[in-house]
Amino acid sequence: MEIAFLNSLVVTSPGFYKAEKITLDEVKQWLKHYDGRYKSFIGHKSTAQFLQKLLGIRIEQNRKTFRHMKYQKAICFSLYERYPENVLLTQRDLEKARYQFYLLTRLD
């Protein structure tokens, strides 16, 4: 099973979940653990480009719906601030923004 990349901390399927704050280094460790098997569900192009630069891997923009499978892990990129509706964040905006990574695991 692959690990998923999401651009928010969101529950997409009914179930029991565990959410843990993780560091950038831990994100990279999880990618190694999965031998590079991941799929992006990052819906915003600027966020995908920012994560690609930050992680040094290809992160594609993908607006498909993610469905969390049993026991699957997802790396969630979450901004601390809420931006006005219909505002597209630039690379510079994201570089200045405060954010956190979470590891979201479906437990059932």
Swiss-Prot record:
InterPro entries tied to this protein: STIV_B116-like (IPR015055), STIV_B116-like_sf (IPR037236)
Top-level taxon of origin: Bacteria
SUPFAM superfamilies for this protein: STIV B116-like
The name this protein goes by in its record: Uncharacterized protein YddF
Species this chain originates from: Bacillus subtilis (strain 168)
